[in-house]
Amino acid sequence: MLYWLGLVLKSHIFLFNVLRYITFRALIAVIVSFLITLVLSPIFMRKVTALNRLYGGYVREDTPETHSKKKFVPSMGGLIIILSLELSSILLMRLDIAQTWIMAFTVFGFAIVGFIDDFVKLKNKKGISARSKMLGQIIVSFVSASLLYFVMHIDTHIYFPFFKSLKLDLGYFYIVFVMLILIATSNAVNLTDGLDGLAIVPAMTTAFALGIISYVAGNSILARYLEIHYVENAGELAIFGMAVVGAGLGFLWFNSFPAQMFMGDVGSLGLGAALGMLAIMSKQELTLIIAGGVFVVEALSVIIQVSVFKITKGKRVFKMAPIHHHFELNGTPEPKIVVRIWIISILLAIFTIATLKLR
């Protein structure tokens, strides 16, 4: 919206010319999304805390007993994150390109699935069934993948990091590939969201790294110089990536230890879908594995735990999965686990950006 305002007013007021630049709008996105989250969160917390107390509170069943004290901490704080992202993208991204609207739809769709689950948990602690939850994600991801393929006509090649020209064309199977990325990423973020402040910082660092790469991929000169695949209008995705950073900072203000609110499934599923879409639309699907390495490890720990338990009929690799609970049961304080994972996520983001030259 502001992009077009800049085009209209630049001939009358020179300062409005800066609204044409992606870098300036990305900076504004950080500030706007941060302020929206910071201002609305206290109001939201008061409302949801009252609901939590009315229905007896909620804490995940698959957590250590020490988490029982968090039962009245308001969940669904991710609503504010998603609202902030949607408003920031509509305000600051170009509205004449498919990327803006497909991103907005995908994030909103996954967030709705998470919100329904969170809302049901207020009365029924188990939430909606796993089958219903997965069905919702499949429907949203299929629509998003179809929009990418049939409307945006996205390139169906997969480009491999560290290689200049290695690529694989999936053709129609790219639709299924997109669905797998969106569902896997959203659920991986959901699994990671188990300690105060744990999931939001890796989400921010992943979005930042993918935002930087999106900017490069959308700039024909930089893309040619660094020998990565050029994607028309991908630079606009950098604005969304920076909005995730701003909204994340605002949320972390209240989510850091001891947490005053949690993001809930509405936040984790929505954020996961956002990260997946950033990677997909910038043609960095495989780079997401590096940038979001924390989420990959957390998800793998659950897969390993469940698989070994079923195969051996009762044996476990970890004391509890996801792996952050294993560290917790080993006696490592929650804040120390969280900060260490933050450090790892920052290093992964740095390495992800470095892959631009490592090819």
Curated annotation (Swiss-Prot):
It is an enzyme of class 2 (transferase). Keywords: Cell cycle, Cell division, Cell inner membrane, Cell membrane, Cell shape, Cell wall biogenesis/degradation, Magnesium, Membrane, Metal-binding, Peptidoglycan synthesis, Transferase, Transmembrane, Transmembrane helix. One of its GO terms (cellular component) is plasma membrane. It is a multi-pass membrane protein. Pathway: Cell wall biogenesis; peptidoglycan biosynthesis. Its main location: membrane. It catalyses: UDP-N-acetyl-alpha-D-muramoyl-L-alanyl-gamma-D-glutamyl-meso-2,6-diaminopimeloyl-D-alanyl-D-alanine + di-trans,octa-cis-undecaprenyl phosphate = di-trans,octa-cis-undecaprenyl diphospho-N-acetyl-alpha-D-muramoyl-L-alanyl-D-glutamyl-meso-2,6-diaminopimeloyl-D-alanyl-D-alanine + UMP. GO terms for molecular function: metal ion binding; phospho-N-acetylmuramoyl-pentapeptide-transferase activity; UDP-N-acetylmuramoyl-L-alanyl-D-glutamyl-meso-2,6-diaminopimelyl-D-alanyl-D-alanine:undecaprenyl-phosphate transferase activity. The chain crosses the membrane at residues 24-44, 72-92, 100-120, 134-154, 170-190, 197-217, 234-254, 261-281, 289-309, 336-356. It comes from the Bacteria. It is found in: Cell inner membrane. Catalyzes the initial step of the lipid cycle reactions in the biosynthesis of the cell wall peptidoglycan: transfers peptidoglycan precursor phospho-MurNAc-pentapeptide from UDP-MurNAc-pentapeptide onto the lipid carrier undecaprenyl phosphate, yielding undecaprenyl-pyrophosphoryl-MurNAc-pentapeptide, known as lipid I. Belongs to the glycosyltransferase 4 family. MraY subfamily. This is Phospho-N-acetylmuramoyl-pentapeptide-transferase. It comes from Hydrogenobaculum sp. (strain Y04AAS1).
